């Protein structure tokens, strides 16, 4: 037997905290057990502890090739029964954030003709035996601008067709939440929609960035009202993304107070640095970041930082069962770039099929995100899978230079501890048949 290659360790108050990134498991052992395993003295470990270590993937048999097993998982994901359809109902937006990379198109929306094309495309997907669910992700622009008039009727029409096939649709919405009004919430509840809602920090900072003539007193309170209205109305799920820079964390206590009463299973916090900013050289941002993470965990909020998590792909957009369809019928393969002719990869036709630009499609299809030497060596590979295909297309052979670990603003020991505490809180909220092991 041998230690899993994908073990990470950090000291903790009870001994050594183990994190296996392959199986996404955690354990705490005493220091003596840790030393015995590092020296290969498995016969000196108690049978109970050894069984727990093996059962959770921290120790594997000598002939196990974990990397090869991972690669098999990577390619299996491409045959999933879920199809991910990102729909851009509009590239217009009712706020203008200085950091937004998109080129907004005022007044753009889904015409009746384009709605028919999307419906036929969804029909064609649902007619396939290997597709059981279409996951609609509404993106933009601001996808809620014409929701009641155009988007909701289209989704219900597709949902009704899916029912005739004993299939289903799921709906998630990436929104600034300023268009979520009380009359729309019952529609969202009927669709069981989930959300990513973005704020730019505390009230004053958010209002200085997300400005709208319609909301003269600012949009922050509008967003907070929408969060409460949604979570009070139905069993919604909200990923509250907080965009931050070097000043944001100094004033975030007010945000904590504003969401303190939200049911914990209905909300998760995600921290994302504004991509045009960099951490300060004196590491004060990392200190504030760590303190905020710990404060949120103490209050039993689930939280994510950096795009690591056990999955079988680098980016959802990399999967074969994925497409991005714009309001005008143009088709893309990435939501992290502006929706222009440069990045367009196809067009939706009247019969509900896609005419692809085959040279672009084939170039993307040949890329594996996991096989850069730096990624092969990395113990976080099962949680990352390397740069996404879009970045590899733009920056070939740059995986090590562009590794997300280079942007991590807390230490690896702090990161492992945060992940453990976050998992503990998740299991406390939702329950789990395999509790965290303390040995």
Report each predicted region and the residues it spans.
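N-terminal [4Fe-4S]-dependent radical SAM core
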Residues: 3-28, 47-86, 129, 438-439
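N-terminal pre-triad scaffold of radical SAM enzymes
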Residues: 75-101, 119, 123, 128-137, ...
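Local cysteine-cluster metal-coordination motifs and their immediate loop/turn environment
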Residues: 92-102, 371-391
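Radical SAM/AdoMet-radical enzyme domain recognition
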Residues: 119-137, 146-273
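Short Fe-S-cluster ligation motifs
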Residues: 121-141, 401-439
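Flexible glycine/acidic-rich beta-alpha junction loops that bind and position SAM and/or redox cofactors
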Residues: 204-209, 267-286, 308-315, 338-345
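C-terminal accessory region of radical SAM enzymes
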Residues: 284-310, 336-385
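Short, small/polar residue-rich loop motifs at catalytic or cofactor-binding pockets
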Residues: 316-320
């Amino acid at each position: 037997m041998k230690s899993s290659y994908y073990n990470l360790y950090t000291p903790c108050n009870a001994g050594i905290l183990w994190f296996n990134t392959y199986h996404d498991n955690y354990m705490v052992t005493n220091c003596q057990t840790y030393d015995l395993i590092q020296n290969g003295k498995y016969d000196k470990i108690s049978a109970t502890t050894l069984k727990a270590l093996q059962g959770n993937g921290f120790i594997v048999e000598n002939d196990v090739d974990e990397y090869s097993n991972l690669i098999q998982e990577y390619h299996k994901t491409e045959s999933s029964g879920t199809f991910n359809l990102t729909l851009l109902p509009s590239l217009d937006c009712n706020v203008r954030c200085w950091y937004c990379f998109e080129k907004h198109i005022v007044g753009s929306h889904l015409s009746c003709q384009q709605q028919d094309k999307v419906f036929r495309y969804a029909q064609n997907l649902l007619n396939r035996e290997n597709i059981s669910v279409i996951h609609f992700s509404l993106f933009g622009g601001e996808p809620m601008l014409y929701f009641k008039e155009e988007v909701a009727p289209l989704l219900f029409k597709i949902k009704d067709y899916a029912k005739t096939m004993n299939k289903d649709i799921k709906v998630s919405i990436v929104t600034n939440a300023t268009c979520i009004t009380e009359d729309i919430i019952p529609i969202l509840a009927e669709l069981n929609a989930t959300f990513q809602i973005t704020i730019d920090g505390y009230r004053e900072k958010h209002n200085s960035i997300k400005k709208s003539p319609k909301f003269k007193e600012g949009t922050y309170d509008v967003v907070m009202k929408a969060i409460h209205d949604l979570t009070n109305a139905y069993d919604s799920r909200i990923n509250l993304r907080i965009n931050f820079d070097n000043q944001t964390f100094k004033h975030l206590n007010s945000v904590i107070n504003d969401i303190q009463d939200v049911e914990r299973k209905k909300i998760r916090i995600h921290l994302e640095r504004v991509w045009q900013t960099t951490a300060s050289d004196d590491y004060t941002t990392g200190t504030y970041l760590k303190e905020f993470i710990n404060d949120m965990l103490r209050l039993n909020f689930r939280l994510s930082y950096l795009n690591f998590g056990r999955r079988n792909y680098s980016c959802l957009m990399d999967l074969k069962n994925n497409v991005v369809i714009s309001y005008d019928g143009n088709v893309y393969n990435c939501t992290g770039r502006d929706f222009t002719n440069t990045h367009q990869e196809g067009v939706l036709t009247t019969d509900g099929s896609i005419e692809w630009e085959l040279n672009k499609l084939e170039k993307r299809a040949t890329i594996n995100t996991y096989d850069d030497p730096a990624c092969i060596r990395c113990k976080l590979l099962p949680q990352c899978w390397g740069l996404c295909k879009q970045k590899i297309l733009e920056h070939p052979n740059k995986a090590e230079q562009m590794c997300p670990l280079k942007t991590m603003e807390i230490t690896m020991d702090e990161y492992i501890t945060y992940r453990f505490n976050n998992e503990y809180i998740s299991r406390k909220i939702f329950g789990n048949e395999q509790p965290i092991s303390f040995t």
